[in-house]
């Protein structure tokens, strides 16, 4: 059960019912209070009815109708009846107040109309009198002009007679006649002057009356204008005061819609300008980071390629030396020596019969297909490595060519060492043939420095091999010499592998530095890309927000239109009730 208070919005119901002067605010508050009380009472009655129905259903599934005497109204029913009567009284009171306002407004309009008629009559009367006096005044002015003209004519005639009299003989009859005419004209002139004086006096009187009437007319016109302005101001003030709460809310809603629309548009423009500026800056930053990333990647790739070539070359050399060392520890050298001896004998027989060495012809493709490309590859690798270290291009090319030729020669020397301990004569013959080919290659590579070196290269290689064997102990015990050679070569392999590992590690570190810089630039580029994507998202959100605000504005306009339509319908209904 709701606790219903008899006071709503600070206006007791008893005071409202007994009040003889109720304003719009009071009536509106009373209507709201009555409607709220009515709703609460209906809710209580519905709840009680539901409780009774539930109890009846719980007692029996079938309800048998019973005839009972009508009950008197309980407290809730009496309150509902009271509220209904209150709503009816307040409605009649509101309608009565509106009728009284309309009646007062009609009376005010009638009084204003009557006053306007009075002003109109006075102004029309004064205007008619002024027009009459104006016509009389014009007539008197014409009379004055005629009188002045008549007096002037008489004066001219008198002057002519006086001139004639002065010329005549005093005793002549004509002079007497002219004297009598002069006297008559003088009498007429005096009469004309007297008439003019009367006309002038009357004209002045009419002029005075016309001036008074004109002033009265101007005064009435000013009074009428002041009254009209005051009435218009009062009517405008009354119209403004007569605006209801709904109309004021409608006006406020229209102002609010205008402000929201303007602010929404300006906000969207500012957001778009800001986002565009940020996108331009991010775009420039991304282009710069992209260029830096590409440069770092190119550096890393170039270093990897150079170090890879160096590693491959060193690895190949170490592999060859390892094979040579392994040959000294097993029986592979004997088979290789036998093959070498057979080749040398066969080559001698063929050369004696035909005059051509097939060994030289057989080694030619190897030099063309293997040794020369190897020397060129080594020369290019050393040249690029030196250029990377800052050496001049011409000097780097020359030094690289020499180092490449030396490296290729070392490969051939290792091949000669392979069979040197088994068959010195075969090795010498093999070295002689290889020496000729190497001599030709080195002569083409550095002609000024090695111009006469090819003819003596076979002896030089043979003597170098002999000195190498002697240095390593090849003149002593053959088995011990092989072991010593194998040991030294294995040590050289280990040292070379260490150098190769260090070189590759250094290259890897340098490459990692470039890759780290490239990764940093790539991270900055990715971050800038993400920021650009976020800016695009913010732009979409700003446009979506603008659309949502436009929908809110449309809803407000629809609400305002509906409110105005409802107000018009209520006004029509009230007008119909008033005129009924």
Curated annotation (Swiss-Prot):
The organism's place on the tree of life at top rank: Bacteria
Originating organism: Shigella flexneri
Induction per the UniProt record: Synthesis of this immunogen is repressed at 30 degrees Celsius and restored at 37 degrees Celsius.
Secreted found in the keyword field: yes
Region ranges (IpgC chaperone binding domain 2): 51-72
Entry's family note: Belongs to the SctE/SipB/YopB family.
Locations listed in the record: Secreted; Host membrane; Host cell; Host nucleus
Membrane topology: Multi-pass membrane protein
UniProt protein name: Type 3 secretion system translocon protein SctE
Family annotation (InterPro entries): BipB-like_C (IPR006972), IpaB/BipB/SctE_N (IPR032391), T3SS_SctE/BipB (IPR003895)
Keywords: Coiled coil, Host membrane, Host nucleus, Membrane, Plasmid, Secreted, Transmembrane, Transmembrane helix, Virulence
